[in-house]
């Protein structure tokens, strides 16, 4: 039996270890998700980053449980992340949403549960529509609830105490929101997940968060690539990072692919990454992004690519002012 690669981990402030490289479940097709997760586990992946909003947690759970049943991996060797969607921020709905996730995954607990966005949509019952996405109970119209983030956070803290979640964290939060949340929290966020690629580097946010003892996971590591199939005009009008001369020249120098350079750029700075791939060779390549180091010149040249270009901005949904 072939040995699976050893993946470095980040020690979280909750005491747990989170793998530095994982498999992202966003936009993984329901028809193929179970097999993709199972094959990723066989390849050596241990971190799986999912969410209620992705609509594929049942299938992700099937892949996980098949691998556990076959003895490929033990549950405690996996690190499973999910995220609380915007319609479930009211404290009375938080556990209901988590229970739905646990039921779909067919697991007793998740390793990490994040607030997906600092946005409280109007509650939609699970039996009415799940996942609700942008549905707020009234066609295409957005409706909101007056739920402070700290109230949602306190509900998550109770679920840590109940043993249903090992670590709690946040996603798509700005420095000011984190600064405020920490002052009211009993349990500090273990992880911040953010959009992170050379076109959107956010160095001050990263410096603040890492100094505060909060680990960072970057999503959309390949920049516009993730958003092309969504027909995002911003992505379609942006040069792909895979073809960018700076990235290509660094890749050629190290004998690596542009994707590996983009992932190593993050992991070398202790930022976890969660790429996905259907291709077995790329799956393995994405996992082996800690066996080489970028030089200071490489890092300096990539730093010059930052133009503050964000592809995932709720302002585009309904003028929601998270990042204004």
Swiss-Prot record:
Q: Which Gene3D superfamilies match?
A: NADP-dependent oxidoreductase domain
Q: Which InterPro entries match?
A: AKR, AKR2B1, Aldo/ket_reductase_CS, NADP_OxRdtase_dom, NADP_OxRdtase_dom_sf
- Report the top EC class in one word: oxidoreductase
Reactions it catalyzes: xylitol + NAD(+) = D-xylose + NADH + H(+); xylitol + NADP(+) = D-xylose + NADPH + H(+)
List the EC numbers from the record. Answer: 1.1.1.307
Q: Listed GO molecular functions?
A: D-xylose reductase (NADPH) activity
Residues recorded as binding substrate, renumbered to this chain, are 116
Catalytic residues of the enzyme? 54 (proton donor)
Q: Which GO terms describe its biological process?
A: D-xylose catabolic process
Q: Where is this site: Lowers pKa of active site Tyr?
A: 83
Tell me the protein's name.
NADPH-dependent D-xylose reductase II,III
The species is Candida tropicalis (Yeast)
């Amino acid at each position: 039996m072939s040995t699976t690669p050893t993946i470095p981990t980040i020690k979280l402030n909750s005491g747990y270890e989170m793998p530095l490289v994982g498999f992202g479940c966003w936009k993984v097709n329901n028809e193929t998700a179970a097999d993709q997760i199972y094959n990723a586990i066989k390849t050596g992946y241990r971190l799986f980053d999912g969410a209620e909003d992705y609509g594929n947690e049942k299938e992700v759970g099937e892949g996980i449980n098949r691998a556990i049943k076959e003895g490929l991996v033990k549950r405690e060797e996996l690190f499973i992340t999910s995220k609380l969607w915007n319609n479930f921020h009211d404290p009375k709905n938080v556990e209901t949403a988590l229970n739905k996730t646990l039921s779909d995954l067919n697991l007793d607990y998740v390793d990490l549960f994040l607030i997906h966005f600092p946005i409280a949509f109007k509650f939609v019952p699970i039996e009415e529509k799940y996942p609700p996405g942008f549905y707020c109970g009234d066609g295409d119209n957005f409706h909101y609830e007056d739920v402070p983030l700290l109230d949602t956070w306190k509900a998550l803290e109770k679920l840590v105490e109940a043993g249903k979640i090992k670590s709690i964290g946040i996603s798509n939060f700005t420095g000011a929101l984190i600064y405020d949340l920490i002052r009211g929290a009993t349990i500090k966020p273990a992880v911040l997940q953010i959009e992170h690629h050379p076109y959107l580097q956010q160095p001050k946010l990263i410096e603040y968060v890492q100094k505060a003892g909060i680990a960072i996971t970057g999503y959309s590591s390949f920049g516009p690539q993730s958003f092309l199939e969504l027909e995002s005009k911003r992505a379609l009008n942006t040069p792909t990072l895979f073809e960018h001369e700076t990235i290509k020249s660094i890749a050629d120098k190290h004998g690596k692919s542009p994707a590996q350079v983009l992932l190593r750029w993050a992991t070398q700075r202790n930022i976890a990454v969660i790429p996905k791939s259907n291709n077995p060779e790329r799956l393995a390549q994405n996992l082996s992004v800690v066996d080489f180091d970028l030089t200071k010149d490489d890092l300096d040249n990539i730093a010059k690519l930052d133009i503050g270009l964000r592809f995932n901005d709720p302002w585009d949904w309904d003028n929601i002012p998270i990042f204004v």
